[in-house]
Amino acid sequence: PPIRVFGTVGFICSMWAVDLGGMQENAGQFAFSGVLSLLLAAYALTLPACPVSHAAERKSVVEALGLRAFTLFRQKRMALFFIFSMCLGICLQITNGFASPFIFSFGGIPEYADTFGVQHANILISISQISETFCILLIPFFLGRFGIKRVMLIAMLAWVFRFGFFALGNPGSGVWLFVLSMLVYGVAFDFFNVSGSLFVDKETDISIRS
């Protein structure tokens, strides 16, 4: 969990650096990302070796490539889980890729051009990751109280509110709806990812987990 949390903290710091460094609307953000990637690559070389465990028995090509995991689609509950996972994955990429341009687009409207949301869209969006960090702490309680399936349903419903609040908000008088959308993101992302991981761990054989 600490590694997972600090990954999100790094995400937040990068968003703030891009925003405050004036790189939101230019190629500077790619150069910044490239430099960070090189630094992380250099750091990775200092990590201890993690040798792969070589099993005594010989494996077929199918097993070696992990293709046996596709047999899980024969199970109705796993097939449904994978389908919903892909759908929510699409939602995640939409919100990651288009949240900032959507807020920036309000800059073309004089009423919103000088608002904090338009000027600092990345900082506003980073509330999503801040919420994500804190929502991780709620998961043990919700899993114990409601179980894996209900927690997954809560996450799916949260995605509806995430996009609903986002669609209704604006950087001016409706910025509170944007903030609500960011706060709900923590539930939408964390609850499904963690409960989904537990579900897969519970339903699959150890030989095909990843």
In which residue ranges do the predicted regions lie?
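Intracellular juxtamembrane helix-capping segments at the cytosolic ends
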Residues: 1, 191-205
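Hydrophobic core of transmembrane alpha-helices in multi-pass small-molecule transporters
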Residues: 1, 86-87, 162, 176-191
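Helix-to-loop junctions at the C-terminal end of transmembrane segments
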Residues: 21-23, 134-148
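Symmetry-related core transmembrane helices of the 12-TM Major Facilitator Superfamily/SLC fold
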Residues: 29-46
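Juxtamembrane intracellular "pre-TM" segments in multi-pass secondary transporters
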Residues: 48-83, 108-110
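Pair of pore-lining "gating" transmembrane helices in MFS-fold secondary transporters
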Residues: 74-95, 183
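Short amphipathic helix-loop junctions that connect adjacent transmembrane helices
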Residues: 97-120
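C-terminal ends and interior cores of transmembrane alpha-helices
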Residues: 157-172
